[in-house]
Amino acid sequence: REIFSLIFTNNVKPLTKSVFLNLRLPRVLMALISGAGLSLAGAIYQTIFHNQLASPDIIGVSSGANLGAAVFITILSSSIIPTALGAFIGALLSVLLVLLLVKGTKESNTSTYVLAGIVISSAAKTGIMLLKYFADSESELAAIEYWTMGSLSSITATKLLYIAPFSIISMVILLIFNRQIQLLSLSDDEALS
């Protein structure tokens, strides 16, 4: 009832308005953006790998992102910009490593990518465990744990403004290239016609 009053009449207590606008709304919006991004990433992986069970962790992207974030947390800080940048770099490096591993083989089919992804994912998880072992137990270890578990509890309007534009722009770009991505699900003969 108070949210309804806030949206339509603006006849609420200042504390209620502050809690809604500064705590609840940024978390809800971040949950929507995260969910949309994850579902889009999952759909793209399912298209590329011709497998309805495929997800971003199938070629080590999730583990690489976690390792990148953990490295940046231990080296720089646990603030949102360096951590997100570290996660992006880690995910990108894991994809590049998978591509390099597959390039060195005789065949480059879906199974080869998955096996290379398992190798990269295992290596990244080992790196995360080492970083946790050597991390400062007061701050770094907790920050790494919270990052790997995932939580929206620390999202504020400021953090949302940092993250949302990159996420939304990335999703729009992927949707623009939807036709080309869908062509990946076709066989070579079907794609040529």
Q: Where are the model-predicted features located?
A:
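Alpha-helical transmembrane segments in inner-membrane proteins
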Residues: R1-S193
